[in-house]
Amino acid sequence: MTKKKAHKPGSATIALNKRARHEYFIEEEFEAGLALQGWEVKSLRAGKANIGDSYVILKDGEAWLFGANFTPMAVASTHVVCDPTRTRKLLLNQRELDSLYGRINREGYTVVALSLYWKNAWCKVKIGVAKGKKQHDKRSDLKEREWQLDKARIMKHAGR
């Protein structure tokens, strides 16, 4: 019987989309696989990915990740033409796709990429069904975050 491999230290997260949580209310999250080329996997292993401007489009019964940027490595991609911003297919089952279509057809909803991470040896993307925030919503979130920090600071000094 073979031994299990020891877990490598470090985070499995490749990239986060912090702006999505700031600009949208995330109502539901899904985990999707990505159809990648070989050079893209090597770039992800090196951590060269940016999903800050990415979103998901639903077309012809399939979901596509649009706007994600995977910077090609110079040594890994000498024999192929690399398009860092190509549209990548998301791997979801039919039930999840139907749920996404149903949510998108409602007014004001969109699907955004939230994070890119490794799950075992597979690259996964967490996508979220989101509704845009207004400016006053962003301000109230900022006030709430500052209040949480102030509470923590007060509790820390109260124990002294």
UniProtKB/Swiss-Prot annotation:
Compartment list: Cytoplasm
GO MF annotation: an example: RNA binding
Any single biological process term in GO: trans-translation
Domain of life: Bacteria
SUPFAM superfamilies attached to this UniProt entry: Small protein B (SmpB) (SSF74982)
Keyword check for Nucleotide-binding: no
Transmembrane helix found in the keyword field: no
Keywords: Cytoplasm, RNA-binding
InterPro entries assigned to the protein according to its UniProt record, in alphabetical order: SmpB, SsrA-bd_prot, SsrA-bd_prot_CS
Cellular component terms (Gene Ontology): cytosol
Function according to Swiss-Prot or TrEMBL: Required for rescue of stalled ribosomes mediated by trans-translation. Binds to transfer-messenger RNA (tmRNA), required for stable association of tmRNA with ribosomes. tmRNA and SmpB together mimic tRNA shape, replacing the anticodon stem-loop with SmpB. tmRNA is encoded by the ssrA gene; the 2 termini fold to resemble tRNA(Ala) and it encodes a 'tag peptide', a short internal open reading frame. During trans-translation Ala-aminoacylated tmRNA acts like a tRNA, entering the A-site of stalled ribosomes, displacing the stalled mRNA.
Family: Belongs to the SmpB family.
Protein name: SsrA-binding protein
Provenance organism: Salmonella arizonae (strain ATCC BAA-731 / CDC346-86 / RSK2980)
